[in-house]
Amino acid sequence: QYLKGRTLDELKATTANDAGLWPDDHEGFLDSRAFYAGKTASDGTNRYIWGWCPTRPGNDNTNVGANPNEPEWAGNLVAHKLIQHEDGTLTLGAVEGIDAKYAKQGEAAVMAKSDEGVTEAGGTYTLTGDAYLLFSRLNVHNKISFTVKTASADDKFGLSLCRGTDSDKYYSIIVNPEGGGKRKINFEEEGPEGKGFIDGIDGYVFNAPADNEYRVTVYTDNSVCVVYINDNVAYTNRIYGNQKNCWSVNSYGGTVEISGVDVRYY
């Protein structure tokens, strides 16, 4: 089902008395507030959408233009592939041509880890409590892939960029439990001098996977960052300073398994 209307009144009429007819997932969103003015086109087989990722005044990752302000409406183009699921819902995924560009093998060595809460067996890491793994420095254009298996639907985990062993602040994309088997991507400035949760740039609510497995792929191109999870979640943000810096995977109080860590670049 899709909403169609030639005028605003016609569009409103299509939604009258429709309680229960439309799925609540995604709340009508395809991406974060850092993707705007999207247009779509087809290659005859697949449909794609491209739009803009806004810049941040003063290159400040926390100055996202939260309500009542507005983001800095300028920036760089971001493209996604539109995915239509069996129930008719739409999500966004990676564009094959963009993915293929990240062809060079990068380094994914563990440079540091939390003093407690990290074990490793056969290339799979288990993080327990407030734990992290810090990986080697990224390039300028990066593709980061890994799989997270949580012990429950309420275990919290995330990825941090611009992070070192003694950073006063760094920037985290966190898969946060929202209760009732729901999740949401939050953006936080962590560290001793960090502001914590950044309002106005969190993602949309989505269902936790039944098997608690999250296949995460992150693309960075200079300061533009796009995250995909399970072909079901897309999240775009602008994160200055991620180039040539280390990155980490984190747990927050629960137990998560990290496997298949891979870094590519061009």
Segment roles from a protein language model:
Residues D25-G28, A131-R137, L159, I201-A208, ...:
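Beta-strand-rich interaction surfaces with strong enrichment in secreted/lumenal proteins
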Residues Y2-L8, I239-Y266:
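Ligand-recognition surfaces built from glycine- and aromatic
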Residues G122-G191:
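Secretory/extracellular carbohydrate-interaction modules
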Residues N46-I49, L90:
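Entry beta-strands of beta-propeller and related beta-repeat scaffolds
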Residues I144-F146, D211-I229:
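Short tryptophan-centered beta-strand motifs in secreted/extracellular beta-sheet-rich domains
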Residues G191-R215:
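Short, aromatic/His-centered strand-loop micro-motif at the edge of beta-sheets
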Residues Y36-K39:
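Beta-propeller and closely related beta-sheet repeat lectin domains
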Residues Q1-D31, C53-K113, N222, N232-V233, ...:
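Beta-rich carbohydrate-recognition and catalytic domains
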